[in-house]
């Protein structure tokens, strides 16, 4: 795979993630989780901007359209994300895919240093997203806060 094709693929992947996060945010019932998911969505938006700018510097036009995979990722997230727990479960799968794809891109040869640096930075974001989602699932944070963002009151479930 050429470096240009790899960067285009990462742009598509991040575009898909933006749409998947939109569905997960809609499904999420807890404000602290929703806020974190919005932050992660913002990271993916920045990835698209940074990678697109890098492609332009390399003399290429970015293709920010989503493809059929993106449609299925967004649809899967919408269908499976009903409530905070299921939104997190759906996004865990999406972030596992994104993290793996970025890891593979970090290992590509013949990539300009400036491009490699952007990919490394984005990969670090993906690792952070996945770790937070895993932590949230492990700690069942939806049980620690009432829907709408209010922490549980003493003596109340």
Show where each model-derived region lies:
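Alpha-helical bundle segments that constitute or directly flank the non-heme di-iron/ferroxidase center
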Residues: 1-28, 85-110
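Membrane-interacting alpha-helical segments
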Residues: 1-4, 58, 72, 78-84, ...
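Alpha-helical scaffold segments that form or flank carboxylate-/histidine-based iron centers
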Residues: 2-10, 30-49, 84-88, 113-127
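Short N-terminal secondary-structure initiator segments
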Residues: 7-27, 41-55, 147-149
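Conserved alpha-helical segments that form or flank metal/cofactor-binding pockets of metalloenzymes
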Residues: 32-67, 129-140
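Carboxylate-rich helix-loop segments that flank metal/cofactor sites and access channels
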Residues: 49-99, 151-152
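Preference for long, well-ordered alpha-helical segments
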Residues: 94-157
């Amino acid at each position: 795979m050429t470096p240009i094709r790899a960067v285009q693929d990462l742009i598509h992947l991040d575009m898909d993630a933006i749409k998947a996060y939109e569905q997960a945010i809609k499904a999420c019932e807890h404000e602290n989780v929703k806020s974190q998911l919005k932050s992660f969505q913002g990271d993916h938006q920045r990835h698209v901007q940074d990678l697109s700018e890098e492609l332009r510097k390399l003399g290429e036009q970015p293709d920010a359209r989503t493809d059929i995979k993106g449609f299925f990722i967004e649809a899967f997230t919408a269908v499976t994300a009903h409530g905070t727990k299921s939104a997190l479960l759906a996004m865990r799968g999406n972030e596992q895919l994104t993290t793996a794809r970025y890891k593979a891109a970090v290992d590509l040869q013949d990539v300009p240093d400036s491009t490699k640096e952007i990919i490394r930075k984005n990969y670090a974001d993906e690792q952070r997203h996945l770790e937070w989602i895993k932590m949230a699932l492990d700690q069942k944070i939806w049980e620690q806060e009432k829907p709408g963002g209010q922490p549980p009151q003493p003596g109340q479930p």
